[in-house]
Design a protein with these regions (language model features):
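N-terminal periplasmic "start-of-domain" segments of outer-membrane beta-barrel proteins
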Residues: 36-68, 93-94, 102-105, 158
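N-terminal periplasmic accessory domains that precede
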Residues: 73-76, 93-96, 133, 145-167, ...
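Extracytoplasmic beta-strand/coil segments of soluble accessory domains associated
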Residues: 74-112
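Short acidic/polar hinge/loop motifs at secondary-structure boundaries
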Residues: 85, 96, 112-138, 182
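Face-selective signature of the C-terminal outer-membrane beta-barrel domain
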Residues: 245-267, 296-447, 462-463, 467, ...
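Outer-membrane beta-barrel signature, preferentially recognizing the C-terminal barrel domain
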Residues: 301-305, 357, 406-408, 478-543, ...
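Gram-negative outer-membrane beta-barrel transporters
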Residues: 427, 535, 539-542, 560-655, ...
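C-terminal beta-signal and adjacent terminal beta-strands/loops
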Residues: 651-658, 678-732
Length: 732
């Protein structure tokens, strides 16, 4: 990949703002009286934790989490370096690091993998103490993190803090939603703890328009001709949710502590919608038919999850500590979709789909930490995890979708050592072995998959001077991505409308192998004297046995033997390479120019490039990885009044992905502007106004299939709207 042009542009921009050298004080610079006293904030502690870590880590604490008044954690993460959100602007979606999601990005909660079915959008910033982002895996956090790891640390109890209460309403396209967040701190002598409750009553409109064009030439298996379909869908969804978690810590004698962390999520969603569909066909160059149809739809779903995490710490001596963690969880999900045809053409069938699953999960982790006399800190651990799923599904499209029983068992053992080689060098080396077994039984028979991976991992930090604020990080790692339960043993899902390359049936593949990646990361960091950081990071991952959904034309399916069906299933398609450049700058403007206002600047710029070697180019990139992502944000406190103003601009360009020699996918550009104002009436009461997606733009996506004398393109336009939130924030 050629990074010269982007890198040059960034260097020019840094130079124009005074450069790195200007942002730090010269060693012998005289002390100037600035006329005010600077007080260190929690943000400085987050920056210091980042600087002291041997493995590359970004820490986002309470100050950053609260800054913009975001409604979900995903809205906070989208502004971080290299992080993108899948889907339309303002609609949430899967979190992706370096443009990679779907198993490439590992999500942890309090250091443990999140339970099945958990959505990061179910967490509000008020429920979280801090977020740690690791760009390279470690033996302790796990190697299933080709793109990186996001560790969410839930709220911790602090004796001195009063309760927090936040009540607000938001408005989107004429629909009002409400939300409440309450944080209660326990202040007893024997117990330190926090209870957090978040409730929502949200209305969300949706408006999609899909145009599908199909052509069959003389070489196809159908008569030469073409068709044009236009599908317009409108929905109004209503979501009600209640999330609660607690962190309770008892301190015993001689370094003994017990922490219990119960967690509960309840979410119910209902929507009513309307579909209008028209289709025109041409055969032999002459109009053959024109049809139209419409339907009413209803969608009802419910998700309930309860989980108890626990942690026991036992300090045997000043240098030896044992930690035991456990997690027990249960989740239930039910879903029902009804479609009622209003016309008579048969383009939209009257149908019902229903699905329900139950997951039972448990995890048991033990870790021993020893500080040796020669300065080495050795951590060794054993992990056990099990998940059982029972699923029932019914669909009227063809036959019953059937039932499924599946289980996943995982165990891992690891050891790592962190030490200081000399005042200039720190190192962190580890090795991890992990074994995963997945078994399932469906109406299509029994399926089984087992994989084992050994991952050596090495990190190092070099400082030009022992007390230097400049440092260079290096990582050489082995990471991997395992097939998901859905990839391996999923029930066959049939297309609701006429089967085609852009509306295929979907099924699993029990023969998948895990993706393996060898990676290297190199970063240069400068920590500024008065707070802030400048960093540049380059990375590369060489991936083997890449997993990708591929659509094929089949006549031998078990559910429609002898019929022509387009089927999408996951396959190991070969090898891939991904690499990138990540730049970050966080500073206060008066650190550069003393005469300008003290505006806090947060900016990052990332460039990505990838190639799937067994797919012809151009655009043979990894799925849904943009070529770049950028954020520019700022905050300013007006000193003459109790008002703080701020905002952020997020940008992802449009791009095309060639998924196979016959398939292409298009993702439109995303430009999201968020602004806010915070008025403090007194230290305990404030009013916040936030405008998300200030300048809404339609979001475009598309898919194309060309092969065997058959071509089809489907383009979807998704509308989105400005969201205005008004929230009262109180400390009680």
């Amino acid at each position: 990949m050629n990074f010269k042009k982007p890198a040059t542009l960034v260097l020019v921009s840094l130079t124009s703002t005074g450069g790195w050298a200007q942002l730090s004080s010269p060693p012998n610079a005289p002390v100037q009286d600035m006329g005010r006293v600077e007080i260190k904030s929690n943000r400085d502690n987050d920056t210091e934790e980042r600087r002291q870590s041997t493995a590359a880590k970004i820490v986002i604490g309470r100050e950053e989490l609260d800054r913009q008044g975001d409604g979900t954690l995903g809205e906070v993460l989208k502004r971080l370096p290299g992080v993108t959100i899948q889907g339309a602007p303002g609609r949430g979606g899967a979190i992706r690091m370096r443009g990679l999601g779907g198993g490439y990005t590992q999500i942890l909660m309090d250091g443990q993998r999140v339970p099945p079915g958990f959505s990061i959008d179910s967490l509000t910033p008020e429920m979280i103490e801090k977020v740690e982002i690791l760009r390279a895996p470690t033996a302790e956090t796990g190697a299933r993190a080709i793109a990186g790891t996001i560790n969410i640390v839930l709220r911790e109890g602090l004796r001195a803090n009063p309760d927090d209460l936040k009540v607000g309403s938001s408005f989107e396209n004429g629909h009002r939603s409400e939300g409440l967040n309450w944080v209660h701190n326990i202040k007893s002598e024997a117990l330190i703890g926090t209870f957090t409750v978040s409730a929502m009553n949200m209305w969300r409109p949706e408006d999609n328009n899909t145009l599908t064009d199909t052509e069959v030439d003389a070489l196809g298996k159908l008569p030469a001709g073409s068709s044009h379909r236009e599908r317009h869908t409108e929905n109004l969804g209503h979501r009600q949710g209640l999330n609660a978690n607690a962190r309770l810590m008892w301190r015993g004698e001689e370094g003994k502590t017990l922490v219990l962390m119960p967690f509960m999520v309840y979410s119910e969603f209902n929507s009513l919608g309307h579909i209008d569909l028209t289709e025109s066909k041409t055969v032999g160059g002459q109009s053959q038919s024109f049809s139209s149809d419409s339907a009413q739809t209803s969608n009802n779903s419910r998700f309930v999850m309860t989980r108890l995490n626990g942690q026991w710490n036992q300090r045997f001596s000043a240098d030896t500590r044992f930690e035991f963690k456990f997690g027990l969880g249960e989740s239930h999900y039910s879903y029902k979709f009804n479609q009622t045809e209003l016309g008579t053409s048969g383009l939209l069938n009257t149908m019902t789909e229903a699905q329900a699953f139950k997951d039972l999960s448990q995890s048991w982790n033990g870790k021993l930490t020893q500080v040796l006399q020669n300065g080495h800190q050795v951590v060794s651990g054993l992990e056990l995890e099990g998940v059982r799923r029972t699923e029932e599904a019914v669909a009227d499209v063809m036959d019953d979708a059937g039932n499924m029983r599946a289980r996943t068992q995982r165990w891992a053992v690891y050891t790592q050592d962190e030490w200081s080689i000399n005042p200039h060098w720190n190192a962190h080396a580890g090795i991890r072995y992990e074994n995963i077994l997945t078994e399932g039984v469906t109406s299509e028979g029994a399926k089984r998959n087992q994989s084992a991976v050994l991952s050596p991992l090495l990190h190092a930090v070099w400082k030009p001077q022992p007390d230097s604020k400049d440092q260079v990080r290096m990582s050489l790692t082995r990471s991997y991505k395992t097939p998901t339960l859905v990839n391996l043993v999923a029930l066959t899902s049939l297309s609701r409308e006429a089967n085609s390359p852009t509306r295929p049936d979907r099924t699993g593949n029990p023969g998948l192998k895990p993706e393996l990646a060898t990676g290297i990361d190199v970063a240069v960091e400068r920590y500024l004297t008065e707070g802030g950081v400048l960093s540049a990071n380059v990375f590369r991952r060489n991936i083997s046995d890449l997993i990708r959904y591929v659509t094929s034309e089949r006549y031998d399916t078990a559910w429609a033997p002898g019929q022509r069906r387009f089927v999408s299933s996951p396959q190991n398609v070969g090898n891939a390479i991904t690499q990138g450049l990540e730049l970050e700058a966080k500073f206060r403007m008066d650190q550069v120019w003393t005469t300008v206002p003290a505006i806090d600047i947060r900016s990052n710029l990332s460039f990505f490039h990838s190639r799937v070697l067994d797919v012809l180019g151009p655009n043979n990139r990894l799925d849904q990885q943009p070529s770049m992502t950028a954020n520019l944000g700022g905050d300013y406190r007006i000193r003459s009044m109790p008002l703080t103003l701020g905002g952020n601009v997020n940008f992802n360009p449009d791009y095309t992905t060639r998924r196979s020699n016959e398939q292409w996918a298009y993702q439109g550009a995303k430009r999201v502007v968020d602004v806010y104002g915070l008025w403090k009436f007194n230290p305990a009461t404030a009013l916040r106004v936030t405008v998300s997606n200030l300048v809404p733009r339609d979001y475009l996506t598309g898919t194309t299939y060309i092969g065997n004398g058959f071509s089809e393109t489907a383009n979807t336009n998704t509308r989105n709207w400005q969201n205005v939130q008004v929230r009262l924030e109180m400390k009680i």
